[in-house]
Structures are given as C-alpha cells and as structure tokens.
C-alpha cells in the first residue's frame, strides 16, 4: 500500500501484540459524546453500544420480508465500498444493506483505480471525499488502514471497517453475536468454542472481544499451537490443543478456515491431516451440548475444517449468519450516519 503514512505490516508477532493490547490507544470511533461515528473495532466499544446495534438489527430483519425491501434512512447519502481485498459475502451484504437503506452505493474497482497506478491511499480517500462521499466501507490487507482513513477523512464522513489484515472484522463479530443471541437468548450462561486458525483470524479477534463484552462466562480457543496467538489466557480465554476435549459441553461452535493467504510459511501438514485432527465431524459435534449450534464466517473449506454433514446439518446456522448479516450491517450504517462530533 502506497501511503504517506503507512499502515503497519502484518506478522505473527504484530498480530499477537494487537490481540493482547489493542491496535491504537484511545477510541477514535466514538464522538466526543460517546456515540458511534465510525465502526473500526469491537474492542473498546461499550456494552451499551453493542446491544444498541443488535437491538436495531432486530428492527431491520423484517425488512427482508416486505414486498418493498427499503427504508429511507440513508436517502440522499453516498456509500463507497472500497474493497482492496477480494470478498463475496461481506461486499455483497454491505451493498444490499446500503441499498435497502435507500443510499446511493458506489463500488470502487480497485484494479482499475488510481491506487493501482501508484496513488496513495490517502490521496484516493481525499479525492473520493471531494465527490461528497458520506460513508466509506473499507476492506484492506493492511491492519490499521480503516483507522488511517478515519483519522484523515472529512469530518462528515463515516468509516466502517469491513476487515483489516489480521486485526478486526467488527461487523462479522456483531452478526455472529446477533446469531448467537437469536438462538441462545442469554449470553451469560454460554460456553463458546472458536476452533481453528485463530492466529491469522480477524474474525476470532472480533468475536472474542464481543463475547467478553457481552458477558459470556467461558470462551474457548481450540487449535494447534502454531495457530494460536499469545495472550489468550490474559483475556480470560481457555486454550485447548485437543479438539475433543475443547468441544465437551459447549453451546456454540465457531469454526474458522485456514488463512493460507496470511501464512508466511508452512505451519501445518496436509489438508487431510488437518481434518483428521481438527475437522468438525458429526462424531465430534456429539461431544458438544445436544442443542449446540455450529457457525462459520465463510468461506468454508469442506473436508478441511468442517464435514459436509455438519455444515448442512440441523445444528448448522451458517446460512442464517449471512441473512442476519444484512440486518446487522443496516443497523451499523444507520447508527453511524446519525452521529457527528
């Protein structure tokens, strides 16, 4: 990324450091009055704001069932989707969410944009701001890119982090919380297991911060030693290096894919060997609570981290996560658009 002020490079060590101590000091996503102006990370968000987002999403779920699937909340506003990394579910659901809020949505073709010709990220943002953008939805391979944009964009512009490097994916974390609340109601009595490549997963980071904020008494991280970051125990997370032990009696299972594109070297054996030790099969699912739900942020790698019988089975709520994601992203966009310094 070519910027006058560079976002930090990712590494296993820097990912662990951010996991333990946060990305930036302070909370630049809140207004002086403590309202949500940007959504950059779940870390540091007050519980009241998290619950407000989930409660607002409740109001938007029914929009999907209407004959006219629109509300006028963002009418006249321009939302720019800036996806510097490939995405299917996240970009599409953000586009649907903004459209259902009656916003004008523009998807920047990164490969054909001036950033591919050497223009800095901040120059690109300044030019788009001059076109009277009201909101930037940003996905970037560099951790911190959305923070950088939020610090330098025009005062009226709102920034939503759609995933930055290994750091955070706050709307995925929020839609995961919405899904859990929909099926389990009470966070304060749950055991939640996050399984797989947690070291490289921005979703895991956002989920852990959200779960602890909402009062989940037991969060488990399950995976090979090479794929677990340091600092988990200091966050109150129980660490397991054996899948069978970690799944015992859990109420929610969040499976993660291997983030091969973020790995700097060969950390694991073959996909078949990984599935043998860490894949969620019907037999392993039976170790969890009888009414446990299975979640996955996608994309899934069947036969690697999850068996098709589980992914398509009655305890899977994976497709519901996608559906709920639209309402949650509508809620986030609607809330931030109404808050200014």
UniProtKB/Swiss-Prot annotation:
GO biological process: 'de novo' pyrimidine nucleobase biosynthetic process; 'de novo' UMP biosynthetic process; amino acid metabolic process
Top EC group: transferase
Keyword Transferase belongs to the record: yes
GO cellular component: cytosol
Catalytic activity: carbamoyl phosphate + L-aspartate = N-carbamoyl-L-aspartate + phosphate + H(+)
Coiled-coil parts of chain: none
Cross-referenced InterPro entries: Asp/Orn_carbamoyltranf_P-bd, Asp/Orn_carbamoylTrfase, Asp/Orn_carbamoylTrfase_sf, Asp_carbamoyltransf, Asp_carbamoyltransf_Asp/Orn-bd
PROSITE patterns in alphabetical order: CARBAMOYLTRANSFERASE (PS00097)
Matching Pfam families: OTCace, OTCace_N
Enzyme Commission (EC) number: 2.1.3.2
Biological function: Catalyzes the condensation of carbamoyl phosphate and aspartate to form carbamoyl aspartate and inorganic phosphate, the committed step in the de novo pyrimidine nucleotide biosynthesis pathway.
UniProt similarity note: Belongs to the aspartate/ornithine carbamoyltransferase superfamily. ATCase family.
Record text on subunit structure and interactions: Heterododecamer (2C3:3R2) of six catalytic PyrB chains organized as two trimers (C3), and six regulatory PyrI chains organized as three dimers (R2).
Protein name from the UniProt record: Aspartate carbamoyltransferase catalytic subunit
Species whose genome carries this gene: Paraburkholderia phytofirmans (strain DSM 17436 / LMG 22146 / PsJN) (Burkholderia phytofirmans)
Gene expressing this chain: pyrB
């Amino acid at each position: 990324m070519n910027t006058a002020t560079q976002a930090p490079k990712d590494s296993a060590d820097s990912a662990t450091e951010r996991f333990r101590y946060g990305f930036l000091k302070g909370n630049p996503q809140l207004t002086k009055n403590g309202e949500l102006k940007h959504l950059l990370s779940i870390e540091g968000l007050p519980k009241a704001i998290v619950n407000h987002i989930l409660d607002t999403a409740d109001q938007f779920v029914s929009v999907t069932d209407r004959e006219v699937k629109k509300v006028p909340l963002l009418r006249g506003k321009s939302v720019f989707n800036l996806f510097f990394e490939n995405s299917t579910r996240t970009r599409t659901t953000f586009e649907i969410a903004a459209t259902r809020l009656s916003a004008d949505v523009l998807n920047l073709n990164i490969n054909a944009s001036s950033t591919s010709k050497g223009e800095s990220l901040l120059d690109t943002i300044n030019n788009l701001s001059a076109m009277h953008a009201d909101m930037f939805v940003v996905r970037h391979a560099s951790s911190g890119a959305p923070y950088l944009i939020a610090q330098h964009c025009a005062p009226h512009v709102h920034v939503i982090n759609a995933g930055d490097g290994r750091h955070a994916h706050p709307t995925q974390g929020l839609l995961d919380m919405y899904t859990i609340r929909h099926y389990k109601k009470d966070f304060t009595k749950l055991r939640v297991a996050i399984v797989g490549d947690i070291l490289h997963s921005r979703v895991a980071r956002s989920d852990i911060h959200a779960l602890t904020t909402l009062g989940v008494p037991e969060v488990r991280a399950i995976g090979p030693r090479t794929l677990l970051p340091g600092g988990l125990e200091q966050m109150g997370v129980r660490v397991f290096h054996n899948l069978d032990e970690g799944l015992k009696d859990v109420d929610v299972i969040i499976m993660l894919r291997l983030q091969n594109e973020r790995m700097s070297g060969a950390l694991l054996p073959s996909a078949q060997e990984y599935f043998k030790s860490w894949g969620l099969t019907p037999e392993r699912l039976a170790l969890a609570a009888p009414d446990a739900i299975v979640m996955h942020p996608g994309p899934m790698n069947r036969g690697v981290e999850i068996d098709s019988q589980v992914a398509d089975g009655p305890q899977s709520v994976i497709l519901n996560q996608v559906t709920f994601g639209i309402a949650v992203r509508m809620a986030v966009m609607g809330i931030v658009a109404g808050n200014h310094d």
